[in-house]
Amino acid sequence: MPTSNQLLRNSRQPVRKTKKTPALRGCPQRRGRCSKVYIINPKKPNSGNRKVARVRLTSGFEITAYIPGVGHNVQEHSVVLVRGGRVKDLPGVRYHIVRGTLDAAGVKDRKQGRSKYGVKKPK
C-alpha cells in the first residue's frame, strides 16, 4: 500500500488491456502467405491431428493459424485471409484461416453451417 506522499509523487497507472490478436493490428482480417503447413497434437484431454499453417502477414508478423473444417487445399506459398479467434486445445494458436477466400477453398460437401466454411448454397 503506497503512502499519500508516494501517490503525490507519481499517480497510479491504469491497467493496460492486452490485445488478443496483436498481429492483426486492429484490423478484422489480414492477408498472409503460408510458409509451412503442418499437423500438431492438442492438449491433454483431447487427441487427434489439428491442421495448422505458419503464415507471414502483411503486417510483418509470422503467426500460427488454424485451418478449420474437414480437408483443405492450403499449401506452402498459398495466399490466405486470417481472422482472430483462438483454438482452445492448441497452445499458441490465436488465429483462424478464413475458408472460401483467396487460395483457401471452402469445405467440400458441407451442407450445414456453410457460412463458417465458405460454401455456397447447393442448387
Swiss-Prot record:
One MF term in the entry's GO annotations: structural constituent of ribosome
Protein name: Small ribosomal subunit protein uS12cz/uS12cy/uS12cx/uS12w
Entry keyword rRNA-binding: yes
InterPro entries assigned: NA-bd_OB-fold, Ribosomal_uS12, Ribosomal_uS12_bac
Family: Belongs to the universal ribosomal protein uS12 family.
Listed GO biological process terms: translation
Biased composition (Basic residues): 14-30
Pfam families recorded: Ribosom_S12_S23
GO CC terms in record: chloroplast; small ribosomal subunit
Region of interest: Disordered: 1-30
Keyword annotations: Chloroplast, Plastid, Ribonucleoprotein, Ribosomal protein, RNA-binding, rRNA-binding
PANTHER family for the chain: 30S RIBOSOMAL PROTEIN S12 FAMILY MEMBER
Cellular localization per UniProt: Plastid, Chloroplast
Primary role: With S4 and S5 plays an important role in translational accuracy. Located at the interface of the 30S and 50S subunits.
Bias kind Polar residues: ranges: 1-13
Keyword Cell division attached: no
Gene source species: Pelargonium hortorum
Subunit annotation: Part of the 30S ribosomal subunit.
